Amino acid sequence: AVIGNVSVTDPDAGDTHTYSVDDARFEVVGGVLRLVAGQSLDFETEPSVSVIITATDAGGLSYNEAFTVTVTNVNEAPTDIALSNSSLAENTDTTGGLAVGNLSTTDDDAGDTFSYAVVGGADAAVFSISGNQLVITDGVLDFETKNSYVVDVEVTDQGGAGLTFTKSFTVTVTNVNEAPTVLALSNSNLDENVAAGTTVGNFSTTDADTGDTFTYNLVAGVGDTDNAAFTIVGDQLQINASPDFESQSSYDIRVRTTDADGLSTEQTFTVTINDLNEAPTVLSLSNSNLDENVVAGTTVGNFSTTDADTGDTFTYNLVAGVGDTDNAAFTIV
């Protein structure tokens, strides 16, 4: 860059002169003071430069003088954008628009003013600018659904047309542990007469937080009437004693599931006992005495049956086996 012409006053007419500069960034070539190739001056760090130029004539005599080179400021483009905050907690409600953080700009020109605009990025549609704030509007944030947003912001230097800088930002959603929402039991029916310790079913938990672990407990509360009849081992519900449909056909229990951070939900369950047809246990005859000489076909007595299954009907037959010696003398009607 040419700065200016250098001339010297010398009483010796026709003398020739060479020039040197005490600052290596400058040189005098052909009587012109200029910057050495590859050098530049920065107004913001050095608004003026003092140089000493020495003129030497052909006879070796010299003269020097100090000059001040004034650096003229040129508006420069911004070089960076910063965002004061780039993370938001899960469950934050952004429905009405929420400021993520404040935008600031790095620019060599002190005192410059700037404007900002959303110009791109995968999630540009949910962002806007308010003053120097980056604003998001995307309802209630859910880490499990979307854990980060990408937006491109452009800053424009108000002091000069076309002086801009663009930067991409990633706004992250931080996970917040949420309580379990649903407790389920894989099976709630059990045949009567199964052995004590039989597994009814397995518990499972629905939770928005992927990878959570859970513990299960029988707890007091509405619907806990028959908690004492069961034990939970791991995620298995086991019955403590062999159930009998005729004694109790269903059981009510209350269970709590708790995640690793102590958040929980409770659910009541009804375990239904399936009725199984059981064999009769007692066969009785209402009378077993008969007078001699009664007519053939006289009724000796009536059979009745004891059976755990209420309402069962029965048929009766004479059968072969121990004690059947006189079966042929009787008929069952």
Regions found by a protein language model. Name each.
Residues A1, V6-V8, D12-I81, N85-L183, ...:
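Acidic, turn/loop-rich segments in luminal/extracellular domains of secretory-pathway
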